[in-house]
Every structure is written in C-alpha cells, then in structure tokens.
Swiss-Prot record:
Protein name, per record: Transaldolase
Name of a matching Pfam family: TAL_FSA
Catalytic residues, chain numbering: 135
GO cellular component: cytoplasm
Associated pathway: Carbohydrate degradation; pentose phosphate pathway; D-glyceraldehyde 3-phosphate and beta-D-fructose 6-phosphate from D-ribose 5-phosphate and D-xylulose 5-phosphate (non-oxidative stage): step 2/3
HAMAP family: Transaldolase_1
Gene Ontology MF term list: transaldolase activity
Quaternary organization: Homodimer.
Biological role: Transaldolase is important for the balance of metabolites in the pentose-phosphate pathway.
GO biological process, one term: carbohydrate metabolic process
Catalytic activity, as annotated: D-sedoheptulose 7-phosphate + D-glyceraldehyde 3-phosphate = D-erythrose 4-phosphate + beta-D-fructose 6-phosphate
SUPFAM superfamilies per the UniProt record, alphabetical: Aldolase
C-alpha cells in the first residue's frame, strides 16, 4: 500500500519547509521554502561552512574596497539566502521561496528594492526568476510591495498570514501564492482557551485555511494556497487536496512511514458559491487586523522572531568573516 506521503503527493504539491539540503535530497519535493530561522539553523551546521564562506567572498567582491563590516554583512545576508536557494534549486524541479528581510515588513519601497536585488543575485547565477518566489510578510505594506513586484513579473509568496482579511487582500492584489499558517493559530487558541485537544476539523488553523481555500476556489482566484506551519500530521491530513502544503522534514518522514487511506478533504471543484465579494482597502485592512487579536499578535510575533533570526545570522557571519581574516593574517606571517 502507498504511504500517506505518496498519496498526499498525488493530490497536493508537497513542499519541503527546510534549508537542510540533505533532507531535500531525501524527500525530493517539487518546491522548497526557507525563512530566516531555517537559514540560520542550516548556517550553524558545520557541513555548510563552505557555503557560508562562498557567500562572504561573493559579498566582498561585489562591494567596493573600504566598505564597513556592517555593509559587508548586510550584503552577505542577501548572498547567503541566495546561495542556499541556488543549492536547493539544484535538487528540485520547481521553485524555492527566499524571504525578504523581515525588518522591512512595514516599508513598501525598501521591500521592493530588496526583492529586486535578490532576483538579480539569482540572475547572476543564471537562475530564471520563474523559479523564485519572494517571501514577504502579509502586512499592508508587504502586500502593496508584492503587488508592484507581481506587475514586474517577480512572483511572491506572502507569509505570516493568519486571517481571511490578509488572504483576500493578497488575492485581490493578484499575488502568486499565499502561505496561511496553521500551527501558530493552534498555538494561540491553546493558550487562550486552556484547551489542549483540537482534533481534525476542530483545529482553528485547519478551519482558517479551509475557509480561505474554499473562498478562493469559489471566486476563481488564481492565487495559490499553500498551508504552512504545522504542529502535527493530523493537520496536514485535514488539508489534503490544498494547492500546496509546505512541510517540515520530521513530518515528511512521519508521513512517509505511515500507511492507510488518505481522504481528500479540499476540492477545487467546490459546488457552493459565496454571494459575497470581499474587498479590503487600507482602512478596512488595518481595522480588521486590529479587531483580530490572534492575527495581530501572531503577525507581530512572527516578524519579531524572523528579525531576531536575521540579527543572529548577521552575528554568525561577522564571526566567520573575522575567523577568515585571522586565518589569512596567520598564513601571511
């Protein structure tokens, strides 16, 4: 009998949520997603020190002589994300998602500039922009930046998405793909209610993604829905049939070892049609987010967490840069 993972792969595009190249080799997904926390975890792995060194060297060569260390490290953050993305693309047939610095989440212009820069870095390696999804936080400013980028042919993946309002704003902006989070919504409800067991269709994260998916299919939106941030395999099974699901290696492994029948829960050929067409201008969007305590808290928490991961990655790169310089000094004496 086919494993649950094999069955899932036949009805949903399975995406690996990792920067671990060995895990990608093992599970052979079509697409892969990264974020600052995943890149940081991979960068700490001694197996990838060569990749870090290449990123630092490339950054040094791309900047004029005499630039400050802070400018070099800022450039290296972009380069290391692209270097990991490049290596991932060598292992998959589809797309990789590379995230814009989360500290730019409330700056439309800076987000657009950073995204263009990342695409140009990929282009320097001969990688077509069709294979890249630029990940941007689902703030109002992020959605507006993505709307500009999409018109330039730069495809975007809007992340840290926790409610219906964010999703619809992305669809109306004709964004390529959204990543509605599941597990982080569950985390919030567990804390707020004191209830630990939200199983199957009762899982608030599953309910959120199902609502978004069904509305998108009812209205014929082209924006792809990729469920993300899972806490258990039951959440994944409840979203079988979703356009895409991005799954951490530990759950890919668990699903690959499990047998039994997987039931398709989401269907793009949905029969019921919603009579309501939702539109959110900036005022409506901000009010909706303000009124949604869960979405507001989780969006803020996510941006803060990814920002801290970038800062830690900067420290790691600076430390490695100093080590390389010291090695050169020793070799020269």
């Amino acid at each position: 009998m086919k494993s649950i993972l094999e069955q899932l792969s036949s009805i949903t595009t399975v995406v690996a949520d990792t920067g671990d190249l060995d895990a990608i080799k093992k599970f052979q997904p079509r697409d892969a997603t990264t974020n600052p926390s995943l890149i940081l975890a991979a960068a700490k792995n001694p197996d990838y020190v060569k990749l870090i060194d290449q990123s630092l060297e490339s950054s040094r060569k791309s900047l004029p002589n005499g630039v400050s260390e802070s400018e070099l490290i800022k450039e290296a953050i972009d380069q290391v994300s692209v270097f990991f993305g490049k290596e991932i693309l060598n292992l998959i047939s589809g797309r990789v998602s590379t995230e814009v610095d989360a500290r730019l989440s409330f700056d439309t212009d800076a987000t657009v500039k950073k995204a263009r820069k990342l695409i140009n870095h990929y282009k320097s390696f001969g990688i077509d922009k069709e294979r890249i999804l630029i990940k941007i936080a689902s703030t109002w400013e992020g959605i507006k930046a993505a709307e500009i980028l999409e018109k330039e042919g730069i495809r975007c993946n809007l992340t840290l998405l926790f409610n219906f309002c964010q999703a619809v704003a992305c669809a109306n902006a004709k964004i390529t793909l959204i990543s509605p989070f599941v597990g982080r919504i569950l985390d919030w409800h567990k804390v707020k209610t004191g209830k630990d067991n939200f199983s199957g269709k009762e899982d608030p994260g599953v309910i959120s993604v199902t609502k978004i998916y069904n509305y998108f299919k009812e209205k014929g939106f082209k924006t792809e829905v990729m469920g993300a941030s899972f806490r258990n395999v039951d959440e994944i099974k409840e979203l079988a049939g979703c356009d895409l699901l991005t799954i951490a290696p530990k759950f890919l492994d668990e699903l690959s070892k499990e047998e039994g029948e997987l039931i398709k829960k989401l269907d793009e050929n949905i029969q019921s049609k919603s009579s309501i067409d939702y539109e959110f201008d900036e005022k409506d969007f901000r009010l909706s987010m303000l009124e949604d305590q869960m979405a507001s808290e989780k969006l803020s928490e996510g941006i803060t967490g990814f920002s801290k991961a970038i800062e830690e990655l900067e420290e790691l790169l600076l430390k490695r840069f100093s080590e390389i310089n010291n090695q050169k000094l020793i070799s020269a004496t």
